[in-house]
Amino acid sequence: AANHSLSDIIAVKSKPIAALMMLQLPFSNIDINSRDLEQVLCGAKEIFDRHNCIINGGHTMIGKDSDPVIGFTVTGESKLKENKNKKSYKIKNNDILVLTEKIGSGIIFSGINNDMIDSYFQKDVITQMTNGNFLFGNISEKLNILSMTDITGFGLVNHLLNLIKRDKNKTGLTIFPEKIPIFNGVKEAIDKGVKSSLFESNYNTAINSIIYDRQKKSIDEILYDPQTVGGLAFIVPKEEKEKQYAILKKHKINFFEIGYVNNLNNQIKIM
C-alpha cells in the first residue's frame, strides 16, 4: 500500500514529502490489534524512509472485515524546474510508448486465492511490489517524458486511455500485447479461466475505446487486469528514444517498448 500510493507522486515527477496512514484492522483483542498496528507501521516506515518521506499522522479503526484495510495519502513536491530555454515537445504520431514493469498481479493473486495456480507464482509479484518505482523516481527528471501514468487498479488500457485523453492533439495509441511483459503464471491462470475481481468493470469501462486489428485472444485479458504497485507507462519522442533508453539502462531500470502514438482520437488499437 505504501509503494502503491507513492506511484502517483512518482508519475508526476515529484518527490514525496509526507504521508498520512489510514488503517482498519479486524476486530480482535487489544494486544493483537496493537501488534498488527506495529507491524504495519514498521513495514510502511521502511518503504517511506527510502524516499525520505515522513509518516506524520493518520487514523486507525476497527472494522468487521476479516482482512486489514490500509491506504496512504501522500503529499509531494515537484522536482521540475522551469527552463525557458528548454526545447518544448508535443506528442505526435509515432512517438514511443514505454512500460517499466510486468503486469498480471491481479490475475496471479486471484488464481492463488481460488486454488487454481501454485502460490509459487506470487514470488516475483511480491518482489516487484516491494521494490516499487523507487529507482525510476530517483531519475525521472532526467528523462524527456511527454506524458506519464502509473499502472494500478484500472488496468493497463484504462490508464493508457487516461494518458492520451490529456493530450489536446486528440491522439491515440497502437499497442502490441505480445510485447507487454507479464508475470510467470499469468498465461496458466488465464488458460484456467482466472479473472480478477475488477476485470469486468475495467473491461466495460474501456471496451468502447478499443479497436482490435485482429481476432481477440485470451492473453488480451491482461490489458484489463488491475495492478497493485504496477510500473509506469510513458511516451517519449521517437527521435530521442535511444537517448532516453541509455539513461534507463545506465540506472538499471526495466523498460519495454510496447507501442506508439497514432492519430486515432482517444482510442487504442490492439495489434
Regions found by a protein language model. Give the residues of each.
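Aromatic/hydrophobic pocket-lining residues that form the small-molecule binding cavity
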Residues: 2, 37, 41, 129
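Active-site glycine-rich loop that binds ribose-phosphate moieties when present
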Residues: 72-85, 120-141, 215
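Short, compositionally biased
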Residues: 109-125, 251-254
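Glycine-/charge-enriched secondary-structure boundary and capping motifs
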Residues: 28-54, 61-70, 142, 153-271
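Glycine-rich anion-binding loops of enzyme active sites
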Residues: 15-117, 260
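Fold-independent oxyanion-binding glycine-rich loops
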Residues: 1, 53, 58-60, 72-78, ...
